[in-house]
């Protein structure tokens, strides 16, 4: 059933997320812990929906219905639940053992997976067993609910518990279908990207996502409404919307009339923002250790010049932890300004502490690149450690790149570079949030200066005053900029 009432006009803000959001909702995903929690919600150690329903029936139902329902619970539902739990544990043990023999925690499942020895080793029987177990449990729960409501009008308490049972039935069906689709997709299914992932000890995830989302978005979303408005600070790449329209299916026939417009920023970036590009930084791919050390050193210099008020954005948790360890060990940094590190506290709490402190240093990864609004002088310096390219071996990214290459395209320049440009623009946009904000952005990835695609990435950024040179030269430029605006250390 639809959640929203009928509508003819659709407005999507932050529309640069549409493709990834569609992948999450049109694909299927299930985890071992998710199945475990679903079954435990029904009953575990005499707690859950079923024990509560049993107690409510004893207290409220007449004798005939009570005995019939309790007999169903005992004879069909409880054995089906135990069988489903055993089947789930067996299947995910097989998958955990399969991942244990792999070098990576994420394994993409191609056509060759159907011939893997794991099937002959018992995975096929385990998959069939789980499918049967979840289906049998679902049918038993439906029968129980129908027996209760067919012969009696339950009170509010029992009706609420039956609502939970119906929800569990839907989730059981979704889990069963997700496991089947990821491991053994039906013949004739559209191209899927499938993978298995280890997320921790005995925690396995399965996923299957349609490779081609553009036709689905067009048919299921855009063609069903009269008008669509897409807005975001980062929809255009290279001054056009071609990348977005191709990824979302907006260029598929039949064509629709539309207005495409890039609106000018209300901010005077040339006056409000200095954009520093050091040219003497080690390349992160060639010298990861040296680059990491330079990031920490520049972060300390930048914090000193701005007297705190620094965001440092990273593309990996490993790089973040490396920089955090160095900065925490420096009394001239951690002893002077509050050092806030993603993972040490919830995101909202870190942001609140950053705003309240007024002179803190915050180190963050993906979730801090966008959706963060800190106007005013609490944020006056932004350090971007590395260009935000997607990991090319991530299953969905790899499959999309392969599809582009197979059709004669250039996946790096047609897909990875535009995505990096959108992400970089989002990160850059954390700094200037009002007409009175001023600050400095430092990008510590020399590839933007040395590689051909660098000019494309820079062209998509706001028109801040740009300076290029050695870090020692740029540090003086930054100190002068802060001094001009009355910002800086007080030593």
Please describe what each predicted stretch is.
Residues 1-491:
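ASCE RecA-like P-loop NTPase motor cores
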């Amino acid at each position: 059933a639809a959640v929203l009432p009928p509508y003819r006009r659709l407005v999507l803000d932050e529309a640069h997320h549409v493709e990834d959001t569609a992948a999450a909702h049109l694909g299927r995903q299930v985890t071992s812990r998710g199945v475990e929690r679903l079954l435990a919600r029904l009953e575990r150690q005499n707690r859950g929906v079923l024990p509560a329903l049993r107690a409510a029936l004893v207290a409220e139902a007449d004798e005939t219905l009570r005995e019939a329902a309790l007999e169903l619970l005992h004879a069909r539902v409880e054995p089906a639940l135990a069988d489903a739990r055993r089947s789930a544990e067996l299947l995910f043990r097989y998958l955990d053992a399969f991942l244990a023999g792999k070098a990576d925690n994420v394994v993409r499942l191609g056509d060759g997976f159907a011939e893997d020895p794991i099937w002959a080793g018992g995975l096929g029987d385990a998959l069939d067993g789980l499918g049967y177990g979840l289906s049998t449990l679902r049918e038993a729960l439906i029968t129980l609910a129908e027996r209760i409501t067919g012969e009696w009008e339950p009170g509010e308490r029992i009706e609420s518990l039956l609502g939970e049972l119906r929800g569990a039935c839907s989730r059981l069906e979704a889990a069963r279908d997700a496991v089947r689709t990821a491991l053994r997709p039906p013949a004739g299914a559209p191209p899927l990207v499938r993978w298995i992932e280890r997320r921790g000890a005995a925690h396995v995830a399965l996923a299957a996502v349609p490779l081609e989302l553009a036709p689905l978005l067009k048919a299921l979303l855009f063609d069903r409404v009269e008008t669509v408005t897409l807005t975001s600070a980062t929809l255009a790449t290279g001054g056009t919307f071609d990348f977005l329209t191709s990824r979302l299916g907006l260029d598929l026939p039949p064509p629709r009339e539309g207005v495409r417009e890039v609106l000018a920023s209300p901010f005077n970036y040339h006056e409000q923002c200095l954009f520093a590009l050091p040219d003497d930084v080690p390349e992160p791919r060639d010298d990861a250790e040296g680059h990491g050390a330079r990031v920490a050193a520049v972060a300390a210099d930048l914090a000193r010049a701005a007297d705190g008020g620094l965001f440092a954005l990273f593309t990996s948790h490993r790089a973040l932890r490396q920089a955090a360890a160095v900065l925490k060990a420096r009394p001239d940094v951690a002893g002077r300004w509050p050092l806030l590190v993603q993972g040490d506290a919830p995101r909202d709490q870190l942001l609140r502490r950053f705003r309240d402190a007024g002179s803190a240093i915050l180190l963050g990864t993906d979730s801090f690149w966008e959706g963060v609004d800190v106007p005013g002088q609490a944020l006056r310096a932004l350090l971007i450690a590395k260009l935000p390219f997607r990991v090319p071996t991530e299953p969905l990214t790899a499959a999309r790149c392969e599809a582009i290459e197979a059709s004669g395209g250039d996946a790096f320049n047609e897909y990875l570079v535009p995505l990096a440009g959108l992400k970089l623009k989002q990160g850059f946009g954390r700094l200037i949030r009002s007409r009175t904000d001023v600050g400095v952005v430092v990008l510590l990835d020399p590839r933007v200066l040395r590689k051909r695609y660098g000019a494309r990435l820079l062209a998509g950024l706001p028109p801040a005053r740009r300076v290029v040179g050695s870090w020692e030269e740029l540090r003086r430029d930054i100190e002068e900029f802060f001094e001009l605006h009355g910002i800086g250390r007080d030593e």
